[in-house]
């Protein structure tokens, strides 16, 4: 299979980065072709409050030239616009409750804007997965069909 992973980050010790690297390694061992779009290979503005929006735009533009994927797997809401722009079945994995995280980090105005975008992003996915029971409860209470898949660890 030809699979595109879209993630705000793919390196470092953070949870999303570790998950994406583990998923990539597993999928490649099973003879899949994997391509990753992340902040490491797109343009981002490294300023608080601008990194995610700049990643959203640059990853969206990058997918204009990337087609013919069987699966497009976006990690977290900032990756959803690029996912929407790509060909293939669309999986959106949400690592936490995005709009609440933005509200806590950047304030109520940004949180409210994020909540509206989050609603759009969820509608673009063929499948929505979450990693926690809290996220599962939250998104199902909003009426979305969600699958909970806890992050795996390599031991």
Predicted regions and their residues:
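N-terminal subdomain of nucleotide-sugar transferases
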Residues: 1-40, 67, 127
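Short N-terminal targeting/anchoring amphipathic segment
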Residues: 5, 62-79, 91
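Histidine-centered beta-alpha loop that forms part of the nucleotide-sugar donor binding/catalytic region
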Residues: 8, 75, 94-97, 150-151
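A short, charged, and often flexible helix/loop element on the N-terminal side
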Residues: 37-64, 103-110
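Active-site proximal beta-strand in glycosyltransferases
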Residues: 70-73, 86-103, 129
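Membrane-proximal helix-turn-helix segments that form the acceptor-binding/catalytic region
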Residues: 109-128
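Carbohydrate-associated surface elements
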Residues: 131-134, 152
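Acidic anion/phosphate-binding donor-loop and adjacent secondary structure
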Residues: 140-141, 152-155
């Amino acid at each position: 299979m030809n699979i595109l992973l879209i993630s705000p980050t793919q390196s470092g010790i953070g949870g999303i980065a570790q998950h994406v690297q583990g998923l990539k390694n597993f999928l490649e061992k099973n003879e899949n072709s994997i391509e990753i779009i992340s902040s490491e290979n797109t343009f981002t503005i490294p300023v608080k409050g601008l990194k995610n929006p700049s990643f959203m735009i640059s990853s969206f533009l990058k997918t204009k030239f990337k087609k013919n994927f069987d699966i497009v797997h976006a990690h977290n809401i900032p990756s959803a616009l690029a996912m929407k722009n790509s060909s293939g079945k669309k999986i959106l994995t949400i690592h936490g409750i995005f709009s609440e995280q933005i509200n806590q980090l950047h304030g109520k105005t940004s949180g409210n804007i994020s909540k509206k975008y989050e609603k759009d992003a969820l509608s673009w996915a063929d499948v929505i997965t979450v990693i926690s029971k809290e996220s599962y409860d939250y998104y199902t209470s909003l009426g979305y069909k969600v699958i909970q898949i806890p992050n795996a660890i390599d031991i």
